[in-house]
Amino acid sequence: MSNYIFQSVEKLVRRYQTRDPFKLLDALNVVVQETDQYQHLKGYCFLCCKTYYVIISDFLSEEEKRIVAAHELGHIMLHKRQLQVAPMKDSVLYNMRDNTEYEANLFAADLLLPDEDVAHTSKNEELNYFSLCSTLYTTPELMSFKLYSLIRRGNSQYNMPMAIDSKFLGKH
């Protein structure tokens, strides 16, 4: 199975020496802004006059803003052609029905959760799935995408302890 999303994340991390989505967006000259204009829209990205923009709703927690930034970075890195036509708006992250959203979620999980951190932390047999997520400062939903990525790449020691909730960030 193709590893292009994981490889694209690792190439970006090697080049810029960071996994921080905001630092990566800055290094790529992407304009990032927060807005209070939307009640349900988490974020979106678009291309205008050869400049990429990421807009993130300011009602989100810092953790959610980081996930949305990584997700939108995924769109910029993986879906440039689609961005030339129309903005990508994300009212619900973790959407499994739309391939572009699915890919952006995998990108965000691979960016924010390094394989080594997951492998090291998951060796602690005292941690259940939710404790693992808490220890790695992530959501169970994003961890599900990371585990799926690991399994897809042949890491059979992992299993999916919960189903992916495509409406996770859509809940208030």
Predicted stretch roles:
Residues 1-172:
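Active-site hotspot residues in diverse enzymes, especially metal/ion-binding acidic/histidine motifs
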